[in-house]
């Protein structure tokens, strides 16, 4: 990912927070079929390896897992909030007119060798952990035990798990850091006044 110095984010805990806060990640691999990409929920184990390890699963009918069996490098992308930045937000525009539209956003990219697994116990543990993560906070959280055991076994038999020990982690926080203080304040205030939740979140992050 292209990351100008002003927008680089390399604090591991900050990167991990964005990974864990992204409900749906993007898995990209390159193989005999060319580039393949899928949107899937991912689970981070932050203590496994220097940058953590990511876990997920794919349907057996999805050909991407076959490309991953050889240990091919995987790219996992975690997009954060984003916002269109209008030149009209910049006070400096009134002075010299030298302003164009841009975009503010957060993104994390994780790279590492993929490992595919079929073990039923390991798959069950992964699905349980993902379920507990996304059911947390509900009044009556769903658990694997809420469904018939044979049905869960059937569902587990239709998926393949994978792990990606992270070997490289990149983070980008593009929040108008390359502008002067009045322009930064103008963008922040302009986004805060928007009715779009993503705009408001970017404004909050700029404080």
Give the ranges of each region predicted by the language model.
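Binding-site signature for planar aromatic cofactors or substrates
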Residues: 1-207
């Amino acid at each position: 990912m292209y990351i100008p110095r002003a927008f680089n984010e390399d604090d591991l805990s900050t990167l991990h927070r964005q990974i864990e806060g992204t409900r749906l990640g993007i898995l990209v691999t390159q193989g005999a079929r060319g580039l393949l990409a899928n949107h899937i929920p991912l689970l981070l184990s932050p203590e496994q390896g220097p940058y953590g390890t990511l876990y997920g699963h794919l349907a057996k009918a999805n050909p991407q897992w076959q490309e991953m069996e050889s240990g091919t490098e995987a790219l996992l992308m975690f997009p954060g909030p984003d916002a269109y930045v209008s030149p009209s937000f910049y006070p400096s525009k009134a002075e010299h007119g030298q302003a164009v539209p841009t975009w503010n956003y957060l993104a994390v990219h994780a790279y590492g060798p993929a490992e595919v697994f079929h073990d039923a116990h390991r798959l069950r543990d992964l699905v349980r952990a993902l379920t507990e993560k996304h059911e947390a906070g509900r009044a009556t959280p769903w658990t694997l035990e809420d469904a018939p055991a044979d049905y869960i076994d059937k569902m587990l038999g239709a998926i393949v798990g994978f792990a990606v020990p992270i070997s490289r982690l990149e983070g980008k926080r593009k929040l108008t850091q390359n502008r002067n203080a009045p322009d930064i304040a103008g963008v922040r205030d302009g986004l805060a006044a928007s009715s779009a939740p993503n705009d408001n979140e970017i404004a909050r992050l700029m404080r």
